[in-house]
Amino acid sequence: MATLYEEYTLCGVGPDKNSSSSGILGIELGKDVDHIIVTNSSRAVTVYKVSDQKPTGSWTVKQGQLITCPAVYNTKSQEYVVVTDNKVIRVWKEDDVNMEKAFKATVSSDVLRVIAASDSEPVVLFSCGAVMFLDSLLASPQQTIEGVLTEEEFIRWSTVVGAEHQLVLLFCTEKRGEHYLYAQRFNPNTVVKHRFETEPGPFAPISFSATCRGSNIHLQYLYMSGRIYESVLPLRSSVSEAEGVQALPRSLCLSLPLGEQELTSGAAIVLDEAHVAIVGFPHPSAGAGKDYLCIWNKHFQTLQACKELAGTIYSQIWCYSGKLYIPHGKILSVISFECQKSSLAAAMGKLKQTNQSESKSHTPLSSWTALPHNDSINAAKVKSRMSTRNASNVKSPLTVDQLIDHIKTAVVEDVQSAVGEFIHQTPQTDLQLAAGKVTMVLVSRSQTDDSFYPQRAFLQLLDTRYLCYSVCPELLSLAMAKRDFQLCQIAFQLFPDIPEAVTCAYLKTILSTPDSEMETLTLDTESLIIMKEMSPAQSQMEEGEQQNENGVSSSKQQRDFLSMDMKCPVGLHKGVLLNDVLQTAYSDKPLLQHLKDLTVLQVMVFLQYLHFLYLKYSQDVHKQIRALRIPSISQVIDWASLILDAHFTVLAVAPEAKSLVSDLHKFTRSQVKLYAELGKIEGSLQSLKKPKSTEHTGVYSIEVIELF
């Protein structure tokens, strides 16, 4: 899972008059992870201390001069390096006030970029494709530079990666629509040229990002079509490498949903083995004119975090030490992020319990966008029978585009009927791709038209099992805003990729809704049976029994926390929804941050309900209804621990929480004491089982022998 934290402004930017550029030439890491170097496209280089959000130094060139590549920090000499007017290399220290008085050298060929390398001299890349270390170049600035590139070939992107004492310079070039990758290795000094595969249609790579993992270089590149490919190169040169231009094998990592938009720019940067951050591409369910930063998980093809950014996004993004630097509008924002380990267990978080009976009632899917095999067969059979029976009356099925046009103008009833017919008549393979697109259009209109909310259509689309949170993130937000708990319940039972922030928002919505409002809800029958089994007295509660707006029972019931026949502190329907939240996949650390948004009253109600569940488990109630949908005891304990961690200080000082915390402490202590005594009994029983060793009595005699 991935988390984006609150953004803050580092500095302002001066976008060009045509607003197509942010005015930032580049951002490089400074002397440590808390310092960055911002080079604007005019005349200034500024060093910022990120934690303080303040500049620590700034240098400018004279009027008429122009900075032509981003400034970098030389870790070897602890100096800053920049190029002006393509051929003048300037070197200065942090305590130098005036860049003009610092060292400068004019070289014989245009410099494209100076690239910093950790534990090494910076690498100078010339526009002609030649490469030299900075110290070697400055030793003889006017030395002849031999070109590498062919005529009409120019460099579009470059970077340095390294590991295991090996440094590799990568740069991508373009010539007449063809794209090439050069890999310049320094130990030994070799250069290999690769050709990118051609993407079908008028698409070209627009963003590149490279990382080094193990003994390989992983290059990922983004096309205007929304596809991200990965190519793997060996870190060290191979003796068997062929001469000439080599093919660059690639594999598809991620295909971004473009919708109806046409894109000419965008940027993607690799965060770790599984995650990639993207700007300039549309959010799957955002309306036109909205720009987002999105983090996608390539392994599971899911959108895991997003943040809307105000103003124009210039398709620029940099990443250093867990922070993303993104210019948008008239500011440069810093956004911290965190990515959990990219394994199935981590991506799925704390999973639902999987007992035998549950697995029969809810078959796990091999893919989040695929039906179980038997379900697809049954669906095909039903569809076949229906088609045969009504062949003469069935209209030709709508295409996806026709249905979308119909959704944009028709009334709710017509839309719901059209969606139902579309689902019934569309082949499963086509429906798998169309369900998400149709849902996004329905959500988009529902957000702009308050009178339009096709609940039945949403439920039908959910029933296809072709939706997940990443396909349409705004669906759950819309359902919560409409207080559509029936849709939310089904989504939380089906979606395996709901972010922790959405889980907490849903929990807050449930706890803030009065029980009286929930009693009329249509919820899953099986889940209601669970609550009635767990609180039979409450299911037959008389109308005169008072409840407060959050479903808390009378004070007499609340105080009797050590009683095993404690009544449920919330209404049956609210308990059903809370049970679904308890079984939702999550990761501890991201969830803990969002749980802090709950109010004290909401925390108390939730803790009371968790305590109620734990008491029922102590009575072995869960064994009587184990075939039904119910959270496990470990899930209850995990959530209680997280709530206490998130609100420990508040619960410790709030007067109204004193009795609750005290009763929880008493009950926990009694449980610990009980288990300790049971442990002693178990030890005694084990000792009784051990066979006792038989006592052997030794018989001996003394014989006296007289020799003389």
From Swiss-Prot:
A GO-annotated cellular component: nucleolus
Regions annotated as coiled coil: none
TM segment ranges: none
One GO-annotated biological process of the protein: positive regulation of transcription of nucleolar large rRNA by RNA polymerase I
Matching InterPro entries: NOL11, Nol11_C, NOL11_N, WD40_repeat_dom_sf
Pfam family, one: Nol11_C
Superkingdom per UniProt: Eukaryota
Secretion signal span: none
Subcellular compartments: Nucleus, Nucleolus
Keyword Metal-binding: no
Keyword Nucleus set for record: yes
Keyword terms, alphabetized: Activator, Nucleus, rRNA processing, Transcription, Transcription regulation
Function per UniProt: Ribosome biogenesis factor. May be required for both optimal rDNA transcription and pre-rRNA processing.
Protein name: Nucleolar protein 11-like
Source organism phylogeny: Eukaryota, Metazoa, Chordata, Craniata, Vertebrata
Gene: nol11
